[in-house]
A protein has these predicted regions:
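Intrinsically disordered, low-complexity regulatory segments
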Residues: 1-164, 476
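Conserved short loop/turn motifs at secondary-structure junctions
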Residues: 1-3, 103-106, 183-185, 263-272, ...
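Basic, low-complexity terminal or inter-domain segments flanking catalytic cores
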Residues: 2-5, 27, 81, 92, ...
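Structured, non-catalytic alpha/beta "coupling" segments that mediate domain-domain communication
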Residues: 28-58, 193-239, 399-451
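C-terminal or mid-to-C-terminal helical accessory/interaction module adjacent to the motor/catalytic core
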Residues: 73, 115, 139-221, 264
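Metal- or metallocofactor-binding catalytic centers and their adjacent structured scaffolds
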Residues: 238-272, 280, 560
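Glycine-centered, phosphate/nucleic-acid-interacting loop/turn motifs that mediate DNA/RNA or nucleotide
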Residues: 305-306, 530
Length: 732
């Protein structure tokens, strides 16, 4: 009997597909049934080969060998996943396999993962495509009933291939040119370099910012606060103190007369459903999670727990075909603290509107929402619970009625000067009930105060009990944190010099720099290359990063290049542009980049050289700040030796409660805090042991749980081991 080979992107998804398709016979790297054989990749199993596979001379990095423009680019099997590739290849080439179903992630990159494996395996069999947004049993069954012909995704594959090949030509040539020219480990790319430039420009804005003092006038009448307003501009700031003093003198001792009382009924709908970037922003703002951390948690909630839909989405809308499933989804997540809100939604027919249902605003995947699978909240760890909470509350909130209130504005005159007071009376909490008054989570950013305004009428006189001058200062832009950097990457129009409206529109339509799936990795790459560093929660460029921006060609620093690429890649995916035409342009562009770097008169200087010599090549080493602490790195790029000298731990300073760094080696290890506090590791362990003896069962259990969850080694191994052996008896 002929069979169908199903190729998933990851083992966890493959096992789910196998179970639903009744495949029970477990093989090495695959699961087989009567009709289907399910196997899987491990992400990419195949990639574009390094330059040396075209010519041995490319093993050495030399400026004179550039540009490298081999054609066609060859595929190679990734070494660490070669075993799984051979398993997949063998299954694909079985004589009883008549067709292949691509069941990798439904998107450009998922298409590339599968097509490269098929191409490298030299398989010529009919292809079908599974295109689903969640991996619940129901979604998988529906998806297999509606498999699409593989030829319908040929242009998507061409677009993915064009992107990968263009990144190879431009990225490898530019990186080698910079590295060879300046003998430093320098790298650039069409996404990471503009992102670095955006951070640098924000720093320049802050540096050049000159604060201005402004003044205002505040009048109080029987507890009512009235704010001065310019008659012409409606602004309440005065930048000229003499003008403010003059107004103040002219109205001192005078009462106010009400000239207008305006009441307006207002309603406000909940913020839209989450896409990945918005979720990463909120998780960073509320919990301090990095974008990569949030994506990793989301991936578990999608793949392992099957509670949320596909995470790598750039849409905040659902399609009309999802509407019929909403009741089931509300029932599935409506447990525990969500039961009250869910019950209220389910009492009546569910109402939808254009604020979250729009077919035109969904391309590959709809917004992140709960699946129809019931949740056991206790099965989630603390971090999973927090991310799940954000998604569920946002989902329930959009299904709730709007927040309704009456906005009231009192306008009064004191002599010839206008004063206003604003307030609101809540009519119905609506969707805000879901958040129980937690305004940090609901993200509503209310601009109308809750000041209770008195009942006054036009013509009434208000007795002014006090009138005073207020003073403030304009503030510079905030430095980027990971959340605000994601926003800038998503919408980088502000940083584009081009006046070309088409390009501005393209960068907006294509989601800015990078994709929802790659932005977290781009930020991590900038940390890993020591081009940016973290101070507190804020991100800053390093000296190396700033110098790199002085060295790279201007084109590579602007989001405009990405906009142009995405415009063409979009045309390829729609069948309007040939892939080879785009690649030829990229080869020409690579030549230009290399020539510009070769002819540059700029110099690169290591300004972080230490007195420590490299144990491998004896050259002086550089001190760099990585995301996890300080490192010593050999300045010679060909040597590549690196050593950690301190790392940021979870240990909190007893004085200021901030995370401390662990420095030194062996018995000389010492905790150091920015506030100046220092403590030897040995005395820290003793102190913690004493605290543990006094701790409650709950505290100790929590400590052990946190240690087990930590990705890095626990900062206090001896203590963690001792705690894990404790027999914690229940309190009577």
């Amino acid at each position: 009997m002929n069979k169908t080979l199903v190729l998933a992107e990851k083992p966890s998804v493959g096992k789910d597909l196998a179970r639903v398709l009744s495949c029970n016979k477990k093989g090495n790297g695959y699961i087989e049934g009567k009709k289907y054989i399910v196997t899987w990749a491990l992400g990419h199993l195949v990639t574009l080969g390094d330059p040396e596979i075209y010519n041995e001379k490319y093993k050495a990095w030399r400026l004179e060998d550039l540009p490298m423009l081999p054609s066609p680019l060859k595929l190679v099997v990734i070494k660490r996943s070669g075993k799984q590739f051979n398993i997949v290849k063998k299954q694909m080439n079985r004589k009883d396999v008549e067709e292949i179903v691509i069941a990798t992630d439904a998107g450009r990159e998922g298409e590339l993962v599968a097509r490269w494996i098929i191409e490298k395996s030299r398989v010529k069999k009919p292809i079908k495509r599974l295109w689903i947004s969640s991996v619940t049993d129901k979604a998988i069954k529906e998806g297999f009933k509606n498999l699409k012909p593989g030829r319908g995704y040929e242009n998507l594959y061409a677009s993915a291939l064009a992107r990968a090949q263009a990144d190879w030509y431009v990225g490898i040539n530019a990186t080698r040119a910079l590295t060879c020219k300046y003998n430093a480990q320098l790298s650039c790319g069409r996404v990471q370099t503009p992102t670095l430039s955006i951070i640098s420009k924000r720093e320049e804005e802050i540096k050049k910012f000159k604060p201005k003092t402004f003044y205002g006038i505040e009048a109080i009448s029987n507890g009512l606060k009235l704010i001065w307003q310019d008659n012409r501009t409606n602004n309440n700031r005065i930048f000229n103190k003499d003008k403010c003093d003059k107004i103040l003198r002219s109205i001192k001792g005078k009462n106010a007369q009400v000239i207008e009382v305006k009441k307006t009924y207002k309603k406000k709908y909940s913020n839209g459903l989450y896409d990945l970037t918005e979720l990463q922003r909120d998780a960073n703002r509320i919990f301090g999670y990095s974008p990569k951390e949030t994506l990793s948690i989301m991936q578990r909630l999608y793949e392992s727990h099957k509670l949320l839909t596909y995470p790598r989405t750039d849409s905040r809308y659902i399609t009309t075909d999802i509407i019929d499933t909403l009741r089931e989804r509300v029932k599935a997540c409506g447990v525990g603290e969500y039961s009250k809100a869910a019950f209220k939604i389910l009492k009546k027919p569910i109402k939808t509107n254009k604020s979250f249902v729009d077919n035109k605003k969904v391309s590959d995947h709809h917004a992140i929402i709960p699946t129809e699978q019931g949740v056991i909240l206790s099965s989630l760890n603390d971090r999973e619970r927090r991310i799940y909470d954000l998604v569920v509350k946002r989902f329930l909130a959009v299904l709730y009625p709007p927040f309704e209130y009456e906005q009231k504005i009192i306008k009064a005159k004191i002599k010839d000067e206008t004063f206003t007071a604003k307030g609101k009376i809540v009519i119905s909490q609506g969707w805000k009930e879901v958040y129980n008054g937690n305004f940090e989570e609901d993200g509503s950013n209310e601009d109308i105060s809750d000041q209770i305004l008195p009942n006054v009428n036009k013509g009434d006189e208000l007795k002014i009990s006090s009138i005073s001058q207020t003073k403030g200062e304009t503030k510079p832009p905030e430095p980027f944190d990971e959340g605000s950097l994601l926003s800038a990457m998503e919408n980088p129009r502000k940083y584009m010099k081009s006046e070309n409206r088409k390009l501005l529109k393209t960068i907006e339509e294509t989601g800015g720099l990078g994709t929802v799936a790659t932005r977290a990795d781009i930020i991590e790459k900038l940390y890993d290359k020591f081009l940016i560093e973290k101070k507190g929660k804020n991100i800053f460029t390093t000296s190396k990063g700033r110098q790199l921006l002085d060295l790279v060609p201007e084109d590579l620093k602007s989001p405009t290049l990405t906009a142009q690429w995405e415009q063409k890649l979009s045309s390829i995916s729609k069948g309007l542009l040939k892939k080879n035409s785009f690649i030829n342009d990229m080869k020409d562009y690579s030549k230009e980049i290399v020539d510009e770097i070769k002819n540059s008169q700029e110099k690169f200087k290591h300004d972080n050289i230490t007195g420590n010599r490299c144990p491998q090549c004896d050259k002086f080493m550089l001190e760099v700040n990585s995301k996890k602490g300080k490192m010593l790195v050999c300045q010679d790029r060909e040597c590549g030796y690196r050593k950690s000298i301190s790392k940021i731990t979870n240990a909190r300073c007893p004085n200021c409660h901030k995370k401390m760094e662990l420095c030194g080696e062996g018995e000389g290890k010492i905790f150091v805090c920015r506030c100046g506090y220092k403590e030897k590791l040995s005395s820290f362990n003793k102190r913690k042991k004493k605290e543990t003896n006094k701790a409650s069962k709950k505290d100790v259990s929590k400590y052990i749980k946190e240690q087990k969850k930590s990705k890095d080694e626990p900062f206090n191994n001896a203590l963690a081991q001792a705690l894990s052996k404790l027999n914690l008896k229940k309190n009577n």
